[in-house]
């Protein structure tokens, strides 16, 4: 029993550690199920062995144990835990499933608007891809702007940025782009989203001015700490002249999968083209294509219907432009342009998250039904087992009130212990679930906390009602009447 209790404590501690220390969203995906399995193992071990070990320690404490109230309670609890430990562990795990499943899917549905605004920072996002440095990327920008204005919409916001976004891995002296995924040894925590862009595009998009940059000089803006000095990008070395503030607002071009993001700001578009050419020479085109991007973002006025109508016109205009510039033309640097619109994706988001909410409520109801059945069976079976013990306790001199008080305290401890442990499990799962929700563009922590609170209160109310109903049945069996 002691060994089992130690194993349970270690497993539960390991599961909690993984959940509480997860560093990024990618790690959360890989660690979530490992943490769940460890917590389940730890819960079973601690309920079956840990609880009894604690009670036996209390029994060895003579000053505590040899009191009429404590004597009967501790003795009765040892007996009850030996008989019902597995059932209580089942109730605890099922309760945790209900709390986590319902609160998560409820948050996903109520946070649709937040997710939309994070995924589509602007009403309309247009991205053009190029196989080489484009000479006039603003051509598509002008087409998109004219299309929206022709639809009768007023542009309330407009920005554009030429850039190259890459998945890189941190090295001792900088970043490696061409080596990632090519048999090199690196940790997922070293992966970073590297966005390289000209100084003028950075200033236009963020509004932050950058000092003069000479040849071989760059500025950096990173989500984590960075310093001035020399920085290597594969085979080239650059002088970091300035550290810029990392943009506080989200941008359409940021990859939510990357927990660590770095902007590398170069002097001009010619410098960007030179880096692109150098990387292209060592790039594995069969693995993934290396392209230049031109991001355009628009905010427009109008009702939801008017925005959708304008976006449909824009889609048609961009489709016609793509048809006139085939991406398989080797002489043309142009590849293709894509359009994303917030209004057109709203119904899809609500449908998807509404379906997930239904599944979450269905699974929650199913887990709850199983929990209620286990509780009801446990209470009824305990009632028949305790009937003789109830009579014996009265025969040895305990009053009816003392017997009822002792048994009632035992039942309450046994009954509410799984709920308390389930609440602790849910709190421990908070960091890792929050990371997983961030992958779905749900970063409203306050909303998730509210959903957790509402779910716990509703579940606790149902749990208490079940306790009252089954307790009445228990007392009728034991004493012949309800109390």
Residues covered by each model-derived region:
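Alpha-helical transmembrane segments
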Residues: 50, 96-122
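Hydrophobic alpha-helical transmembrane segments of multi-pass inner-membrane transport and secretion
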Residues: 4-6, 36-40, 84-108, 347-388, ...
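Basic-flanked hydrophobic alpha-helices used for secretion and membrane insertion
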Residues: 115-129, 134-369
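Short cytosolic juxtamembrane segments of multi-pass membrane proteins
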Residues: 1, 384, 475-483
């Amino acid at each position: 029993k002691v060994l089992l209790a130690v194993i349970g404590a270690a497993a539960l501690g390991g599961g909690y550690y993984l959940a509480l220390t997860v560093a990024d969203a990618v790690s959360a995906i890989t660690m979530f199920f490992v943490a769940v399995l460890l917590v389940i193992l730890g819960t079973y071990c601690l309920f079956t062995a840990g609880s009894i070990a604690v009670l036996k320690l209390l029994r060895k404490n003579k000053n505590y144990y040899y009191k009429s109230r404590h004597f009967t309670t501790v003795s009765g609890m040892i007996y009850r835990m030996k008989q019902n430990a597995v059932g209580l562990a089942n109730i605890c795990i099922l309760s945790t499933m209900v709390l986590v499943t319902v609160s998560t899917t409820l948050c996903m549905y109520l946070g649709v608007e937040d997710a939309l605004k994070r995924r589509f920072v602007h009403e309309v996002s247009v991205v053009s891809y190029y196989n080489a440095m484009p000479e006039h990327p603003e051509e598509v920008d002008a087409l998109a702007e004219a299309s929206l204005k022709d639809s009768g919409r007023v542009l309330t916001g407009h920005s554009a940025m030429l850039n190259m976004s890459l998945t890189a891995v941190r090295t001792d002296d900088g970043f490696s782009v061409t080596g990632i995924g090519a048999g090199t040894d690196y940790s997922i925590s070293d992966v970073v989203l590297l966005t390289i862009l000209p100084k003028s595009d950075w200033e236009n998009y963020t509004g932050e001015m950058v000092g003069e940059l000479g040849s071989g000089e760059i500025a950096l803006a990173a989500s984590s700490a960075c310093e001035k000095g020399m920085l290597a990008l594969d085979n080239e070395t650059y002088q970091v002249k300035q550290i810029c503030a990392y943009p506080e607002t989200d941008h359409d071009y940021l990859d939510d999968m990357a927990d660590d993001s770095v902007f590398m700001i170069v002097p001009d578009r010619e410098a960007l083209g030179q880096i692109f050419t150098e990387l292209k020479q060592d790039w594995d085109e069969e693995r993934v294509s290396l392209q230049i991007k031109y991001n355009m973002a628009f905010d427009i006025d109008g009702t939801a219907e008017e925005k959708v109508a304008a976006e449909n016109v824009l889609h048609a205009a961009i489709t016609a432009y793509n048809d006139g510039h085939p991406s398989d033309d080797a002489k043309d640097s142009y590849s293709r342009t894509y359009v994303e619109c917030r209004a057109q994706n709203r119904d899809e988001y609500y449908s998807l998250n509404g379906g997930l909410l239904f599944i979450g409520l269905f699974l929650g109801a199913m887990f709850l039904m199983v929990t209620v059945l286990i509780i009801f069976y446990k209470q009824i079976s305990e009632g028949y087992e305790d009937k003789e013990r109830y009579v014996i306790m009265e025969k040895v001199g305990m009053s009816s009130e003392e017997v009822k008080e002792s048994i009632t305290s035992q039942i309450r401890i046994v009954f509410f212990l799984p709920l308390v442990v389930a609440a602790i499990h849910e709190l421990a799962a908070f960091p890792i679930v929050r990371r997983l929700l961030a992958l779905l563009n749900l970063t409203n922590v306050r909303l998730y906390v509210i959903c957790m609170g509402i779910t716990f209160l509703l579940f606790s109310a149902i749990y208490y009602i079940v306790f009252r109903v089954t307790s009445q049945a228990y007392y009728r069996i034991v004493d012949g009447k309800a109390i």
